[in-house]
């Protein structure tokens, strides 16, 4: 007995045989003629509803349009399927009524859908569990780090307090008595004397350095100190090398530097306040003026100077000792002057290939000029004077030629 028999106000329709005649169709849009024979339904039968129990009263009601009869399977061939118009186009009846109802689709898809939903729910639950675990672990780690930092801060604070207390104890020390101050002054004096004694070797080294730089040799009293410092101090070894190199450079520079004058300066120019000795160079004798090589000295003077420089090469490293003053060999009426020759090809004065000798007699030497533009010219010779008229005439002729 079906459930519809128990439900009140239900219509029970017996199974009726329906004949369906189907024919193959040429066009799909045209439906084949169907002849259906329907039997007349029997008269309605009203049944008294039985006693309803709690389970049947709470049962879910089904639609009155649903049927308990099994549906007929649609034909396999698409040409034999029934056609209808749905949603503006022609579709198979099986797609709308027979095989595509929501109930059928839901019944077919429910197992897989339930399984998929179950898996998704399990994954979401697993994510929630992991998230909660991570949150708990993170909070625990933060609490541990905070606790360690607080302990470290407390230790640092204690140490700082101890240091400050010790510092204040050192500051608040009682003032020493007079006896202690005297003892401390004595200790300071002894320390200063000891420090001075320790500084003495440094002073010796400084003196030895000056001697090395001046004489180019190491004094014997400085050798033990230098040996000890050289063995123990690499920087001192470098300093010694630098000092020796400087001494060698100074010696080489002194070898090529010009030598001082042979005779000491006179008392007139000793203080340097009365005048410049260079301005009085013309008054010096030949022997004293050999150091002033200005191109005007004679041949024998230059030769004697070069020979003397060659002979003094062994005196470069000895302190300078002035030579004894030489007496002038000048004799009146016996002087000979050498001048460059200008007769051959108008040679320059510095061209010393040819020279000529001019002998001046004794009675004319007093009337000869010593320097200036008129060297060698006699005073008794008349000077050629030009009057103003001659000068004007010469200038007029000069400009008339240019025109």
Curated annotation (Swiss-Prot):
InterPro entries with a match to the protein in the record: Sas-5-like_implico (IPR048594)
Main location: cytoplasm
This protein's name: Spindle assembly abnormal protein 5
Cellular compartments per GO CC: centriole; cytoplasm
Spans annotated as Disordered: 24-79, 96-127, 174-205, 255-276, 302-325, 355-403
Function text: Required for centrosome duplication. Essential for daughter-centriole formation. Requires both maternal and partenal expression, suggesting that it regulates centriole duplication during both spermatogenesis and early embryogenesis.
GO terms, biological process: centriole replication
Biased composition (Acidic residues): 360-369
Quaternary structure (record): Interacts with sas-6 via its coiled coil domain.
Species classification: Eukaryota, Metazoa, Ecdysozoa, Nematoda, Chromadorea
Cellular compartment(s): Cytoplasm; Cytoplasm, Cytoskeleton, Microtubule organizing center, Centrosome, Centriole
Gene designation: sas-5
Comp. bias intervals (Basic and acidic residues): 116-127, 177-194, 305-321, 379-403
Record keyword Coiled coil present: yes
Coiled-coil zones: 128-163
Keywords of this entry: Cell cycle, Coiled coil, Cytoplasm, Cytoskeleton, Developmental protein
């Amino acid at each position: 007995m079906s459930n519809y028999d128990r439900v009140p106000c239900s219509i029970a329709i017996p199974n009726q045989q329906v004949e369906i005649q189907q024919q193959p169709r040429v066009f799909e849009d045209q439906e084949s003629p169907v002849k259906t024979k329907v039997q007349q339904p029997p008269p309605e039968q009203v049944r008294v509803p039985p006693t309803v129990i709690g389970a049947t009263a709470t049962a879910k009601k089904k639609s009155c349009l649903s049927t308990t009869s099994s549906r007929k399977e649609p034909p396999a061939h698409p040409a034999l399927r029934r056609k209808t118009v749905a949603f503006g186009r022609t579709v198979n009846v099986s797609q709308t009524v027979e095989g595509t109802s929501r109930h059928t689709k839901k019944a077919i898809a429910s197992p897989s859908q339930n399984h998929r939903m179950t898996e998704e729910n399990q994954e979401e639950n697993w994510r929630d569990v992991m998230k909660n675990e991570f949150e708990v672990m993170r909070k625990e780690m933060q609490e541990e780090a905070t606790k360690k930092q607080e302990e470290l801060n407390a230790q640092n604070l204690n140490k700082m307090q101890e240091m400050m207390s010790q510092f204040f104890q050192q500051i608040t020390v009682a003032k020493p008595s007079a006896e202690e101050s005297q003892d401390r002054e004595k200790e300071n004096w002894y320390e200063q004397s000891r420090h001075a004694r320790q500084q003495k070797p440094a002073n010796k080294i400084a003196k030895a350095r000056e001697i090395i730089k001046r004489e180019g040799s190491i004094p014997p009293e400085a050798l033990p100190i230098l040996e000890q410092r050289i063995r123990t101090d690499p920087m001192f070894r470098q300093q010694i090398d630098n000092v020796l190199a400087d001494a060698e450079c100074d010696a080489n520079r002194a070898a090529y530097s010009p030598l001082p004058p042979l005779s000491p300066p006179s008392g007139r120019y000793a203080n340097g306040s009365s005048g410049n000795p260079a301005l009085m160079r013309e008054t010096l004798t030949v022997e004293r003026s050999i150091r002033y090589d200005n191109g005007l000295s004679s041949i024998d003077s230059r030769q004697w100077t070069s020979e003397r420089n060659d002979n003094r090469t062994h005196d470069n490293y000895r302190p300078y000792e002035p030579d004894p003053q030489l007496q002038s060999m000048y004799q009146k009426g016996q002087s000979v002057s050498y001048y460059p020759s200008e007769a051959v090809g108008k040679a320059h004065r510095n061209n010393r290939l040819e020279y000529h000798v001019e002998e001046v007699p004794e009675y004319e030497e007093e009337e000869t000029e010593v320097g200036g533009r008129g060297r060698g010219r006699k005073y008794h010779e008349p000077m050629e004077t030009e009057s103003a008229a001659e000068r004007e005439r010469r200038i007029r002729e000069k400009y008339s030629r240019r025109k």
